[in-house]
Design a protein with these regions (language model features):
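Catalytic loop of short-chain dehydrogenase/reductase
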Residues: 4-72, 83
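Rossmann-like NAD(H)/NADP(H) cofactor-binding core
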Residues: 11, 77, 138
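Conserved catalytic-core motifs of eukaryotic protein kinase domains, centered on the activation segment
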Residues: 22-24, 89-94, 151-153
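Short C-terminal tail/terminal secondary-structure segment
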Residues: 25, 136-155
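A short C-terminal helix-loop "cap" of Rossmann-like NAD(P)-dependent dehydrogenase/epimerase domains
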Residues: 32-42, 94-109
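C-terminal helical subdomain
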Residues: 50-51, 56-59, 78, 100-131, ...
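Short, small/polar-rich loop/turn modules that mediate ligand/substrate recognition or access, typified
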Residues: 70, 75, 135-137
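Short, flexible catalytic-loop segment of classical short-chain dehydrogenase/reductase
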Residues: 81-91
Length: 155
């Protein structure tokens, strides 16, 4: 339907963890669509590696397909949320094992607070609207400045 109307917008969800992936072989398998090999490799690496790798694959797929989609009238972007307060993250923050580490992590967010669902929703709403018509093929970090702090020379 988007292609038929030649006037669509797509927003993918990546993560600010995507640049931290240290398993390019896993990302390459995901991008190649080799699900059995990717699943087999995922069984041998850490959960963080599979998470960041899958999010990196989303961002790379988007960038590789941006020109073709834009030529067909489809704008595509991705958001890369950082730590966001949700019922799931609240449970981890209150966990006796992980709680202290989460509190330390949260104190390192440059803007001084974790993300809220509405922070993500506001950006998605903007990207889906007319005021973002020239933004295409971008990964926008919504992480309170964490990515800029951790990777100041990478963009």
């Amino acid at each position: 339907d988007l292609l038929a109307s030649r006037n669509g917008r797509v927003v993918l969800i990546s993560s600010n963890s995507a640049p931290m992936c240290d398993r390019p072989d896993y990302v390459d398998l995901l991008l190649a669509g080799d699900e059995p090999a990717a699943a087999a490799l995922a069984d041998t690496i850490t959960g963080q590696q599979t998470y960041s790798g899958s999010k990196q694959a989303i961002a790379r797929w988007m960038r590789r397909n941006t020109a073709d989609l834009a030529a067909q009238g489809i704008s595509i972007n991705a958001i890369a949320p950082g730590y966001t307060e949700t019922p799931m993250t609240a449970a981890v923050a209150n966990d006796p094992i992980y709680g202290d580490a989460i509190k330390k992590f949260l104190s390192s967010i440059p803007v001084g607070r974790p993300g809220r669902p509405e922070d993500m929703a506001d950006l998605v709403e903007f990207l889906l609207g007319e005021k973002s018509s020239f933004i295409c093929g971008s990964v926008l970090f919504v992480d309170g400045g964490h990515d800029a702090m951790l990777r100041p020379d990478a963009f």
